[in-house]
Swiss-Prot record:
GO terms for cellular component: chloroplast; small ribosomal subunit. Signal peptide: none annotated. One of its GO terms (molecular function) is structural constituent of ribosome. This is Small ribosomal subunit protein uS7c. Keywords: Chloroplast, Plastid, Ribonucleoprotein, Ribosomal protein, RNA-binding, rRNA-binding. Belongs to the universal ribosomal protein uS7 family. Part of the 30S ribosomal subunit. NCBIfam families: rpsG_bact. It comes from the Eukaryota. It holds the Pfam family Ribosomal_S7. Its main location: plastid. The keyword Protease does not apply. GO terms for biological process: translation. The gene is rps7.
Length: 155
C-alpha cells in the first residue's frame, strides 16, 4: 500500500435511464463476472415490479429502503492485550450506503422466489415499510454496538 497520501474518492456515476447514483451502485454490487447488462436488466425489472406493487415512484421506494437499512454505528474487532473486543465505531454516509446495499442484496438472494428481480423488489418494498431481513440485520448491528458500548474508548 502506498504511503504517499490518501487516494482520491471516486464519485459514483449515474445509470443511463434513471440518472441515479444509487441505482448504479446497486447495479455494480449485483453484477457477477462482469455481466453488467444482465445486472441492469435485473435492476430495471425490479424497479418495474416495485412500480406495479406500490403504485408510487419506485426511486423514492428505493431511497426510503436504503435510508431505512443504512446503519449509523457498527462494531469493529480490535485486539487489546491478548483479547479481541468488538469496538463500536460510527459509520460515514457512503460506507453506510454501501453496507445497506450489500445487506439488501444478501437478504434478497436468500429469499425464496422465482427470479432475482422479483426477490429484490420484494425486499426493497419490505425494507421501505420497515420489515425484512435487511432491517433485521441493521437492528442486530445496532444491538451489538449498544451491548459493546463499554469498549467505545478503545477507538
Amino acid at each position: 500500500m502506498s504511503r504517499r497520501g490518501t487516494a482520491e474518492e471516486k464519485t459514483p456515476k449515474s445509470d443511463p435511464i434513471y440518472r441515479n447514483r444509487l441505482v448504479n451502485m446497486l447495479v455494480n454490487r449485483i453484477m457477477k463476472h462482469g455481466k453488467k447488462s444482465l445486472a441492469y436488466q435485473i435492476i430495471y425489472r425490479a424497479v418495474k415490479k416495485i412500480q406495479q406493487k406500490t403504485e408510487t415512484n419506485p426511486l423514492s421506494v428505493l431511497r426510503q429502503a436504503i435510508r431505512g437499512v443504512t446503519p449509523d454505528i457498527a462494531v469493529k474487532a480490535r485486539r487489546v492485550g491478548g483479547s479481541t473486543h468488538q469496538v463500536p465505531i460510527e459509520i460515514g454516509s457512503t460506507q453506510g450506503k454501501a453496507l445497506a446495499i450489500r445487506w439488501l442484496l444478501g437478504a434478497s438472494r436468500k429469499r425464496p422466489g422465482r427470479n432475482m428481480a422479483f426477490k429484490l423488489s420484494s425486499e426493497l418494498v419490505d425494507a421501505a415499510k420497515g420489515s425484512g431481513d435487511a432491517i433485521r440485520k441493521k437492528e442486530e448491528t445496532h444491538r451489538m454496538a449498544e451491548a459493546n458500548r463499554a469498549f467505545a474508548h478503545f477507538r
